[in-house]
Amino acid sequence: MLLELKLVDEWGEGAIFPREMAFFLTRCQTAGVTQIIESGRQDGYSTRILGEFAKRTGVAIVSIDYEDDKERAERCRKMLGAFPIELVTGDAFEEIGRALQVHDKKTAVLIDGPKNWGAVSLLCASASFPQVAILSMHNLEEGYLTRHFFADLSSEPVFYEKYLDGYQGDAWGRLGEAERVLIDRKGAARGQNSSTIGVLDVANSDRIRIAGAASSHFRSYPPKFIGWAWRTGNYGLLKFVFSATNRWLGAERYRGC
């Protein structure tokens, strides 16, 4: 699909790479996902791919973004207007929980914002909902503690390099070459040495362990607290706790976190 529609060339700095999106969508199809909740659409590159996927498969797409940059948000909404996507404006700590109240759809949760441990905690909390089948997060870079923590939650590889174990099918190879050319042409900040999107199949892992994951890095918003707030409708409390924690303790460090 990405090659057919020439979507590789539309990639912009900071977005999920084409092969990373292809890997995510393939895992969703294998798991029988019928709804994808995306948090963090930025300029809408990955959301556009999700929209094309929805057109072809009928999978429901919910895309959440804070939209603090109104001009950027307007451009993004205009580009995505032709796609069957529910565009939600709001805080992920509230809106992911609201989207998960639809219990009759096998769901994947993809987080590209917020970042860091807040995102990991949101994903782990999502696993407490039985309809959630796939958890995925972007910006899991080499050397980051979040990368290792997320990978350790799974009983199988979460990054495509190890999951595919050297697989080089025709379409995958052509997509990789198109991506390499793109990286060189645009002078991308990162290369293809290591993918930064992890994809975890909850059915092949320990759901209870994921939902109850614990770490001091979660600060005042661990997965169990988030899951409780979502199930009891205390969405605003989560937003308050996350914002207050960042005010009192400072925002999470990004590099090496």
Region locations from a protein language model:
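S-adenosylmethionine/decaboxylated-SAM
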Residues: 21-257
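Class I SAM-dependent methyltransferase Rossmann-like catalytic core
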Residues: 2-31
